[in-house]
Every structure is written in structure tokens, then in C-alpha cells.
Swiss-Prot record:
It catalyses: all-trans-4,4'-diaponeurosporene + 2 AH2 + 2 O2 = 4,4'-diaponeurosporenal + 2 A + 3 H2O. The keyword Zinc does not apply. One of its GO terms (molecular function) is oxidoreductase activity. FAD binds at V7, I8, G9, G10, G11, L12, G13, G14, I15, S16, A17, A18, I19. Keywords: Carotenoid biosynthesis, FAD, Flavoprotein, Oxidoreductase, Virulence. Its EC number is 1.14.99.-. This is 4,4'-diaponeurosporene oxygenase. It comes from Staphylococcus aureus (strain MRSA252). The keyword NAD does not apply. Involved in the biosynthesis of the yellow-orange carotenoid staphyloxanthin, which plays a role in the virulence via its protective function against oxidative stress. Catalyzes the oxidation of the terminal methyl side group of 4,4'-diaponeurosporene to form 4,4'-diaponeurosporen-4-al. It is an enzyme of class 1 (oxidoreductase). InterPro entries: Amino_oxidase (IPR002937), Carotenoid/retinoid_OxRdtase (IPR014105), FAD/NAD-bd_sf (IPR036188).
Length: 497
């Protein structure tokens, strides 16, 4: 008899797991509370402006392509992606600008401000991150290893310690190899992919630089939601039954097993396995009603990653100095991280990510106008949340900074504005305290690991998404879905012996 898999949540991790389970011959039902598939890969359109509500950067497209290849199909028949050799532009408070290109040689050619020594150091750092990336790929990615003990067992103690570089933080690894202060800050902010601090995260996450340099940075034509639409189409073709606008209210259990879910309609649906794309702590808290003592223990080790104050701006002018992806850096990177991740306050001088897809895709804004998305990282929702007045002051601070750093009269040119706070993120995606990136990567608290993909409390409950390994970011959450499918397939194969 065909076994039934229930997937809770249609984010990239959930839809990826659903596709792989269906490709493996299981009956799969996916329940998503929103009316779209993709989770935070969402879309907002108004007044002829188009915005990616969630992620704006596509890296490591091969992870997505694999899902189509399992079905003997090509992703290019479903969605079009475009490589961006000019990966991003970095603006610094003193007026310095650095353009990051795919390739160290190209970066050197386009930045007269960088010396021969800077480029040599950058190449040395890339070589270091390549070594980490390669060993991480062997175990952490290919086999879905979930804990430090599993990694030590797989690679051996000495090999794991040296090649994963668990001795240093990410910023220490950068500062050891890079002397240019601008490059130090730019490379440190690669930690944005997992919503953490480069001063707290383990050096193993330096691999993010090599991943982007080797695999490239891509744009999904028409908006990144088209990638989610492509995965939804593939899932339906593979026989996944998708229920949008349907919320799972709780998970039923018997002893150490989950038995099914109760929907908001009152219907009970049985399952042999449940895969939750809802974050781990909200799943335990709201769907399984885990006791407070165990929840508190989990929250201490697996603290939420950062959230964001997300502004979507329709602007009645053009700023030629902007690239597709831009970063407006802070005067004091350490203080910015300290305020967000330790003091838990809205930062005085935030580093700001600004994406302007209109630079690549002119369909995203009216002629002569620009669609500007602004994202500084801020703390997740605290026990005493920020007030409307706090956010209003922070908005002014952001606009002041952008105008000061070259976006002249930005306020005057805003003709459309839509803002998302951590409270909006929590409400729409049921994320833990409004975090965008799942669990924070912290060398002291969790060695940079997120939750294991297998539940420690229930034998047939699995998790995917940003709160589990291999981590946040679109390719990683998609990979988590494939890894969970591999784990269930291996378990079933073992049971059949």
C-alpha cells in the first residue's frame, strides 16, 4: 500500500520535499495557509511597480535544476534565469564605491581603488573559502549531516576541525586574510544570507563567498516568484495534491509517532510521515503544544535569526549610480551587529541592502521610474515589541542615510510605499518571532548549526526550511527538502530489508 506523506507549508523547502517524495512513489498532500506556493518567495504589485517580497537573489541554481532532472525535465522549460556578472555594488559612508564581479580578476579590473595587494588577498581568501566549500559539500550537503558529532564521525576529528575552521568566527577568518577595511566589511556581510552576525557566526560560513563566486548570481526574469510557480507546476505534474488557503491547526500523535493533522476545516487527515515546512519552534509550540520547559531549552540554543524592516518604494525618478543589487554600509560594522544581535535594538546606522530589479528588467517599473526595495536587518520580535513610533523613526533614519549617501531627494520622489515589519512577517508566514532566516548562526550557541531535520521527539516527523540544516537562503532550504526525502527513502529501504 502506498504510504501517505503530509507536507505542512508550501515554502521552497516544503514544495521541494513534496516533489521528491512524489518522484519516489509516495502519495503526497501539501497544505499551505496562504493562497500562493513559495512561502517568503512572494510577490507584490501595485501602481505598475513589481516587487519581490522575500528573497531577491538566486544562487546555486543547480540545486533547483536537480528537481526537474529527477523527472527527466529541464528547468529552463519552466522558468528563465539570467546570470548577473556584476554581482553587486557597495557604497561606503566616505563615498568609496566597490563593485563585486563574478571572478576576482574581473573585480580587480573594475575597481581602480583596489591595489594589487588587495586583489592578491581577495584571491587568497577565495582559495580558503573554496577549501571549506568543498569539504562541506562532501558531508553537510551531500549526506545531510545535522550535528557536529556527525561531521566529526564522517570526516575524522582533525580533518573536521581544520577544514571546517571551527576555531575562528567568520569575521576573524576574513580579518586574518584581508587588510582592506572596505573589503573586510563587504565580505563580512555575506552573512546576510543567513541573517546572522559575522562576529558571532563560525568561520565555516565563509564558504558563502565561494558559493556565489563559483555558482554565480542570477535573476529570475519577471520576478523570483516565477521560480516558485515553476516548482508548483512540477509538483502538480508529479501528482502532489496541493491545498492552498488551508491551515493545519494541529498535529495528532500517538506515543512517539505523529498520526496525522487536523485542518482548519475540522477535517482529520492521516499520514505515515509528516514534513513540516513551518519553523521548528512554532511547529512544536502551536501544532504539537510542547511543554514550556522543552520549548525554552530549544529557544536558548536555537535563537531566531534577524528580521528586517522591508520597504518597497515606487520612485518617480532614476538613480543611475545604482546597480541591480546594492549595499549601503555602516560607519561601524561591529556596532551595527552588536545592536541587532546583542542589544536587540533598532540600529543607529544600519547596513542597508537595496535591490533595484528595474536595472535588469524594465518591466518592473514604469518608464523613467524605479522599483526600490530596501532591507536593513533588525532584531526579531522582542517580549516588548517595537512600537509604531519606533518604526517611524527608524524609517526616517533609513531615508536620511540613503539621501546622505547619494539618493538625492529620495523622499520627494516616493510615489508608492509598502512596508513590512517583523510583525507582518510573523503573521503571514508563522515564522518564529518574525525572523526572516530561521535560526541564527552562532559559534558559541549552536556552532552555526540549525535544528536537525529529524524530530528528536517524534519518530516520523521531519522538518525543512530555514530553521533546519543546511540553513537559510533559497538554495539551502530547497536542499533541505531534498535531504529529508533522501532520509525517508533510506529509512523505508531499510525497513523493507
Amino acid at each position: 500500500m502506498t504510504k501517505h506523506i503530509i507536507v505542512i507549508g508550501g515554502g521552497l523547502g516544503g514544495i521541494s520535499a513534496a516533489i521528491r517524495m512524489a518522484q519516489s512513489g509516495y502519495s503526497v498532500s501539501l497544505y499551505e495557509q496562504n493562497n500562493h506556493i513559495g512561502g517568503k518567495v512572494n510577490r507584490h504589485e501595485s501602481d505598475d511597480f513589481g516587487f519581490d517580497l522575500g528573497p531577491s537573489i538566486l544562487t546555486m541554481p543547480y540545486i533547483f535544476e536537480k528537481l526537474f532532472e529527477y523527472s527527466k525535465k529541464q528547468m529552463s522549460d519552466y522558468v528563465t534565469i539570467k546570470r548577473l556578472p556584476h554581482q553587486w555594488r557597495s557604497f561606503f559612508p566616505d563615498g568609496t564605491t566597490i563593485d563585486l564581479y563574478e571572478g576576482i580578476k574581473e573585480t580587480g579590473q573594475h575597481n581602480a581603488i583596489l591595489s594589487k595587494q588587495d586583489i592578491e588577498e581577495l584571491q587568497n581568501y577565495l582559495n580558503y573559502t573554496r577549501r571549506i566549500d568543498r569539504i562541506t559539500e562532501k558531508g553537510y550537503f551531500n549526506y545531510g549531516l545535522d550535528t557536529l558529532s556527525q561531521i566529526i564521525k564522517f570526516h575524522g576529528p582533525l580533518n573536521a576541525l581544520i577544514n571546517y575552521d571551527y576555531v575562528h568566527t567568520m569575521q576573524q577568518a576574513i580579518d586574518k586574510r584581508i587588510s582592506n577595511p572596505y573589503l573586510r566589511q563587504m565580505l563580512g556581510y555575506f552573512i546576510k544570507y543567513v541573517g546572522s552576525s559575522s562576529y558571532d557566526a563560525p568561520a565555516v560560513l565563509s564558504m558563502l563567498f565561494h558559493m556565489q563566486q563559483e555558482q554565480g548570481l542570477w535573476y529570475v526574469e519577471g520576478g523570483i516568484h516565477h521560480l516558485a510557480n515553476a516548482l508548483e507546476k512540477l509538483a502538480r505534474e508529479e501528482g502532489v495534491t496541493i491545498h492552498t488557503g488551508t491551515r493545519v491547526d494541529n498535529i495528532k500523535t500517538y506515543e512517539r509517532c505523529v498520526t496525522g493533522v487536523r485542518l482548519d476545516t475540522g477535517e482529520f487527515v492521516k499520514a505515515d510521515y509528516i514534513i513540516s515546512n513551518m519553523e521548528v519552534i512554532p511547529t512544536y509550540k502551536y501544532l504539537l503544544h510542547l511543554d514550556t520547559q522543552r520549548l525554552n531549552k530549544l529557544e536558548r540554543e536555537f535563537e531566531p535569526a534577524s528580521s528586517g524592516y522591508v520597504m518597497h518604494l515606487g520612485v518617480a525618478c532614476q538613480y543611475p549610480q545604482l546597480a541591480h543589487h546594492n549595499f549601503f554600509f555602516t560607519e561601524n560594522a561591529y556596532l551595527n551587529y552588536q545592536q541587532v544581535f546583542h542589544e536587540k535594538v533598532l540600529p543607529d546606522d544600519p547596513t542597508i541592502y537595496l535591490v533595484n530589479t528595474n536595472k535588469t528588467d524594465h518591466t518592473q517599473a514604469p518608464v523613467g521610474y524605479e522599483n526600490i526595495k530596501v532591507l536593513p536587518h533588525i532584531p526579531y520580535i522582542q517580549d516588548q515589541p517595537f512600537t509604531t513610533e519606533d518604526y517611524a523613526k527608524f524609517r526616517d533614519k533609513i531615508l536620511d542615510k540613503l539621501e546622505k549617501m547619494g539618493l538625492t531627494d529620495l523622499r520627494k520622489h516616493i510615489i508608492y510605499e509598502d512596508v513590512w515589519t517583523p510583525e507582518d512577517i510573523e503573521k503571514n508566514y508563522r515564522s518564529n518571532r518574525g525572523a526572516i532566516y530561521g535560526v541564527v548562526a552562532d559559534k558559541k550557541k549552536n556552532k552555526g548549526f540549525k535544528f536537525p531535520k529529524e524530530s528528536q521527539y517524534f519518530e516520523n516527523l521531519y522538518f525543512v526550511g530555514g530553521s533546519v540544516n543546511p540553513g537559510g537562503g533559497m538554495p539551502m532550504v530547497t536542499l533541505s527538502g531534498q535531504q529529508v526525502a533522501d532520509k525517508i527513502n533510506a529509512r523505508e529501504a531499510k525497513n523493507r530489508k
